């Protein structure tokens, strides 16, 4: 989809996006298609409208609290959960004060006895923040920012999983 097409405001946009997402990706080794193309197309169409009203740059004011910004992103942006919002903030350099709690990090915390929850148990912002509090406390004990610690844990656990296979 071209930038011009992305900016257009007609109702056919959602259908066009769904068609693109439903097609198989020729560059993919598995030749797989996108999961839930209609839902993702609807979310992208809604997201487009939301971002046209208030661009991301204005949502990421430097003086804002990272957790508050993440909560606002989750609340306002369709299809964006706490992990995705945290990853976005990290990738644009907005904050290393939020944790990215993926399956590898959660598995590590389970192995060392800090958590008993599964990955699906942190899908809401409330449970994500509760689990993030555990990650933050562990990061403080280790003497590193949570944004660097979760990265190191992710790399270590990913390598360990490959060794176990």
Residue locations for each model-derived region?
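Alpha-helical ds-nucleic-acid-binding substructure associated with the helix-hairpin-helix region
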Residues: 2-78
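C-terminal accessory module of base-excision DNA glycosylases/AP lyases that mediates lesion recognition
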Residues: 40-48, 56-165
């Amino acid at each position: 989809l071209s930038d011009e097409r992305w900016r257009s405001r007609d109702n056919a946009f959602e259908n066009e996006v769904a068609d693109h997402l439903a097609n198989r990706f020729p560059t993919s080794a598995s030749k797989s298609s996108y999961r839930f193309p209609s839902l993702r197309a609807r979310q992208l169409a809604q997201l487009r409208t939301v971002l046209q009203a208030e661009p991301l740059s204005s949502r990421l004011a430097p003086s804002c609290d990272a957790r508050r910004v993440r909560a606002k992103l989750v609340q306002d942006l369709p299809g964006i959960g706490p992990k995705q919002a945290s990853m976005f903030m990290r990738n644009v350099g907005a904050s290393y004060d939020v944790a990215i709690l993926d399956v590898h990090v959660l598995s590590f915390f389970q192995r060392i006895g800090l958590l008993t929850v599964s990955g699906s148990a942190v899908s809401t912002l409330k449970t994500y923040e509760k689990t993030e509090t555990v990650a933050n406390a562990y990061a403080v004990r280790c003497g590193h920012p949570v944004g660097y610690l979760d990265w190191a844990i992710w790399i270590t656990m990913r390598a360990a999983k490959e060794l176990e296979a």
